[in-house]
Amino acid sequence: MQYKDENGVNEPSRRRLLKGIGALALAGSCPVAHAQKTQSAPGTLSPDARNEKQPFYGEHQAGILTPQQAAMMLVAFDVLASDKADLERLFRLLTQRFAFLTQGGAAPETPNPRLPPLDSGILGGYIAPDNLTITLSVGHSLFDERFGLAPQMPKKLQKMTRFPNDSLDAALCHGDVLLQICANTQDTVIHALRDIIKHTPDLLSVRWKREGFISDHVSRSKGKETPINLLGFKDGTANPDSQNDKLMQKVVWVTADQQEPAWTIGGSYQAVRLIQFRVEFWDRTPLKEQQTIFGRDKQTGAPLGMQHEHDVPDYASDPEGKVIALDSHIRLANPRTAESESSLMLRRGYSYSLGVTNSGQLDMGLLFVCYQHDLEKGFLTVQKRLNGEALEEYVKPIGGGYFFSLPGVKDANDYLGSALLRV
């Protein structure tokens, strides 16, 4: 006797019987299966994670010091606003949408079915906050002649120029504004983007977009675990403590003593780099060489010659680089000197995977994002130290830009960029 399987293919009854026996045997070999039913399986969210939310109003925007969520998107836009009043309308509208999307609520009902639906519907009838943050930053080009904002441009904001190892694609660089959208799940990120685009058809045009991720279990650790990049190394071990308010005032936020325009206080310089990895080449590189290039043990993340990930390397006792090479990534990025302390920055990077290149290689890498109170002392100084590092053979920056993340929204009567546009 024969039966048809789920694909409509005839299957002998004996084979079906063996499948059933195998399934029972497998179930019998897992005595803890019932005990695990109440727990979240790896890669899934706990039942209440969709209701997790970040405060929207405050001195600073969320999404900068916020522990990294699992899903992320960078979207750069060209602004279509015709004048300063139109730009204010855009920023007010973005503030309204961000406030709703990040706090959650019922999806709007469409009163007339002959009209387009008011919501994409991809989250269902209730839009859960899902730990969503949307961080708005402005680029150098927003301060051109269109809106009369040139005198108010942040002092260190500039157009990203090419470093020696860069292979920049103009279609993936710069932007009048940049949104960093992060949430526990990717569908929430996509829903937020579509909502924003739907509400701003005459004000914004997408320039470029990239989506990123970190491991779900790393995200759920709320900063206690370090993300691992697609080269297999921990990424962000030496980050300053984002929960230390005094340190963040020194490292991340623009303050009143910096001689910046007054409206920038509470904001932060944002550097974004889209970095493609040559993963096939890297995977054929000996482990010892990989570790020498980074200066860390690949499995533990510890500096070479040390035991634990967060051990502080002692470069003074290794002046010739016999343990940690002089051109290793960690030694160049942070030499641990009194002078280099001023170049600290808060990294918030994500991995990306985007199909294959035209040459048939895997297109994957890092969406590097960092925040600092001074772009020149922070990212630009660090990147100049990294020029010529051994890692350059395996990585290729292809896009990004420099932006300024606006200060936060005080309350429901305020809006993003209000201090800038009221000058």
UniProtKB/Swiss-Prot annotation:
Modification comment: Predicted to be exported by the Tat system. The position of the signal peptide cleavage has not been experimentally proven.
The enzyme's E.C. designation: 4.98.1.1, 1.11.1.-
An annotated GO cellular component: periplasmic space
Annotated signal sequence range: 1-35
A single MF term (Gene Ontology): peroxidase activity
Residues the entry annotates as binding heme b: G236, T237, A238, H329, N334, P335, R336, R347
Positions of disulphide bridges: none
Membrane-spanning parts: none
One Pfam family cited in the UniProt record for this chain: Dyp_perox_C
UniProt-listed InterPro entries: Dimeric_a/b-barrel, Dyp_perox_C, Dyp_perox_N, Dyp_peroxidase, EfeB/EfeN, TAT_signal
SUPFAM superfamilies for this protein: Dimeric alpha+beta barrel (SSF54909)
Protein name according to UniProt: Deferrochelatase
Organism: Shigella sonnei (strain Ss046)
Gene: efeB
